[in-house]
Regions:
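DNA polymerase sliding clamps and clamp-related checkpoint/processivity subunits
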Residues: 1-33, 38-175, 181-286
Length: 286
């Protein structure tokens, strides 16, 4: 790690991004690093995207951010720019960013380093410039193409308030659960946690009504019929923590869960007012 003072910055950058809401970006990094320490950022003139697949947790994260409103500026000869970064290192560099700070992210021409600069709105607060080496720069990487969901009643959509979503998942995490599962039926998604002895259990059920009810794990029994389906997948506590943290980014827009038989569980949330965060959990039918 080193500090530098880049005078005349804009005349020699390959790309630059400015965030007025630095804490929002910090919270985004904090969420996605729960799943994996590495992922792909793609930058272009209209905004930026991020994608990450965790083989261990069987979850894909796909983020699309509109650059408008972010003081976003892109400068590069290539129409797209892809960089593999260590998310854990980014998080460490952003730990001091507060709600009143902004962030600049940029890369200088002919350098293999990316820089994160804290830009504070407070008087007499120094601006820190942190240098982090990029493991590698790539032009291409494999995209994830999730299957399309059918229209109509075969595509149940469950909308949950972000505050309720965070509250109920947090209750499961706090049980110290060692067994975590997601149960899916045509009209509901249930997150459940229990310890090995099942002496401590917690369940958060989100219905298509919509609605929420908490009960003991042993009392949850999905109805199975020709018109219903029952899918169950074990997930790690990292996955639960990830969803708990992204709920803080949605503000008043809520979280949407898309449920369809034989397809990944699709969970859509927002990055403030600037873009969407799509998460796909690979599921196996019982």
């Amino acid at each position: 790690m080193e500090s530098k003072d880049h005078n005349g910055l804009r005349s020699k950058v390959e790309f630059i991004i400015e965030f007025e809401e630095g804490k929002l970006f910090r919270d985004l990094i904090d969420a996605i690093k729960q799943i994996n320490d590495r992922g792909w950022f793609k930058f272009n003139k209209s905004g930026f995207g991020y994608s990450q697949y965790s083989e261990e947790n069987k979850i894909w994260i796909d983020i699309t951010i509109n650059g408008s409103g972010l003081k976003y500026e892109f400068k590069c000869n290539d129409p797209d720019y892809a960089v593999e970064l260590e998310i854990k290192s980014i998080k460490n560099n952003l730990s001091q960013v507060s709600a009143k700070d902004g962030i600049k992210i940029y890369k200088l021409l002919n350098e293999q380093n990316i820089y994160f600069q804290r830009t504070s709105k407070l008087v007499n607060v120094s601006k820190s410039v942190c240098c982090m080496a990029i493991p590698n720069v790539v032009k291409e990487h494999q995209e994830y193409n999730p299957p399309e969901y059918a229209e109509g009643e075969d595509k149940p959509t469950i909308t949950v308030g972000s505050i309720e979503f965070k509250k109920e998942l947090s209750s499961i995490i706090k049980t110290g659960s060692q067994i975590n599962e997601i149960h899916i039926t045509k009209n509901s998604v249930t997150f459940a946690g229990a310890n090995q002895e099942k002496t401590s259990t917690a369940v958060a059920q989100f219905d298509a009504n919509p609605g929420i009810k908490i009960s003991g794990l042993e009392r949850y029994s999905p109805v199975i019929s020709k018109k219903e389906f029952n899918i169950s997948i074990e997930v790690s506590k990292k996955v639960l923590k990830y969803f708990s943290k992204i709920s803080t980014l949605t503000k008043s827009n809520g979280i949407k869960l898309f449920v369809q038989e034989n397809l990944p569980l699709k969970i859509v949330s927002n990055f403030g007012t600037h873009g969407t965060i799509k998460s796909y959990i690979d599921i196996g039918q019982n």
